């Protein structure tokens, strides 16, 4: 019995179900939330799309709860936003809160719910379109005409309080065109449009968007008619200029790519580094010092010297028995077997300083108008007063420096010569004096050999008027001497060979080895010393008086009687004597 009752109940239920299906009734379909939008972060509205009702009346409800809460709330206002909407007023709107929103559909056949939607009011802001869009053509005098577009912010958006910032976007097009021309206006509420086509009617719209949110809907269209006389910028010229500039740039890039280094060198030449004139770096790298020095010497640099003034520290005058005041024997005397003896000067005597070509250059440049000539007196007793033994005759004024020949007294005090530089431009040859030994050799001749030869030579065979010939000018000098010495015809006018009364050479050699003293007047005193003493000691004489400097640059010293009377114990001068006058 029990099994029959159960089967009957199931059968009845199936009959009822089949009857409802045959009538088209079913549970409601699943609804869908479209979006939620807030016009100004103070209120917001949500829209949904309902599903099928199942042939039965269906009731839709919106429920929500805030994140972190368990209490579920129903929509506070279903009417303000319109059908299938829910409006949240300021009382029910909270910022920085996330809402979990769900839409439920209920009928007699069942219940269905939509997928939940998570909403943050800050990021669902979609303002209303801007209001009061205005279009106006402007014709300024100093500028080109333009279309001036002006609008106002949305009415429901609190822009003045700074609650949020709104950006604007404008689009316009000719009425017959299909595409819109969009201009971004940022935060400003006006915009100027140039380059409009004349005779066209333009349509303009504007919209806005907050800093966080969505673009608003476009505002209603506004239109304006552009007159036919509206000036338009001719862009053809600018297009031509742009194309030409692009071609020039391409050519320059191509040239730089091919010849970049040469062009850069031409435009920006390299700055030369510091370089010493005549200094070759390649020669220095090769290590060829000879070529480097030769390159440096070839430059036109003036020679430099550490010493501006050449000073003479030592003066040494030799008066030796082997050297007498007579000219160097010529080739004719050499054929007779007479050879001159050369006396090597002491390398430590400081005599090399006398060879300076710049020494006494001023003296050499001054013309000697009255050359002196010295003669040998016949009376040997006149040796006591050497100053009286010197006879000076003036040569004619027309006589040049080359014609002036010095003559020396044979029995007078032994003299020394001073070497002067001879100018190389002289045509007539002269002897070149480079040291005291050569002067003495030229002046005195040969020492011992000459004395022996003179003893064997007939004294009367030599002429008293024979003089020393220099540079082939002996005859002219003889004639001038004979004319100038007319005041003293009794004395010999030349250099005679040794006579009986006056021996030519001293028996004992004299050698000047030191400077005796220098007087307060700057007079140089030389002290003669004998190497050997035979018999009674001879009285030494001091040759301290400079008689003169001859044209041949020979310094002549004679005894000074006043200097001889001074004491020999006077301390010699420590400094070099001043230049001789």
From Swiss-Prot:
Bias kind Basic and acidic residues: ranges: 329-349
One Pfam family linked to the record: EpoR_lig-bind
Chain ranges for the short sequence motif WSXWS motif as given in the UniProt record: 215-219
Residues the record marks as carrying a glycan: 59, 132, 233
Binding residue positions for Zn(2+): 211-212
Record's bilayer topology term: Single-pass type I membrane protein
Residue ranges, Cytoplasmic side: 259-581
Domain of life: Eukaryota
UniProt-annotated location(s): Membrane
Disulfide pairings: 36-46, 75-86
Motif Box 1 motif: chain residues: 267-275
TM region(s), chain numbering: 235-258
Domain Fibronectin type-III residues, every copy: 27-127, 129-229
Region (Disordered): 321-362, 462-502
Single annotated GO MF: peptide hormone binding
InterPro entries attached to this UniProt entry: FN3_dom (IPR003961), FN3_sf (IPR036116), Growth/epo_recpt_lig-bind (IPR015152), Ig-like_fold (IPR013783), Long_hematopoietin_rcpt_CS (IPR003528), Type-I_Cytokine_Rcpt (IPR050379)
Keyword annotations of the record: Disulfide bond, Glycoprotein, Membrane, Metal-binding, Receptor, Repeat, Signal, Transmembrane, Transmembrane helix, Zinc
Oligomeric and partner information: Interacts with SMARCA1. Interacts with NEK3 and VAV2 and this interaction is prolactin-dependent.
Protein name per UniProt: Prolactin receptor
Organism: Cervus elaphus
Gene that encodes it: PRLR
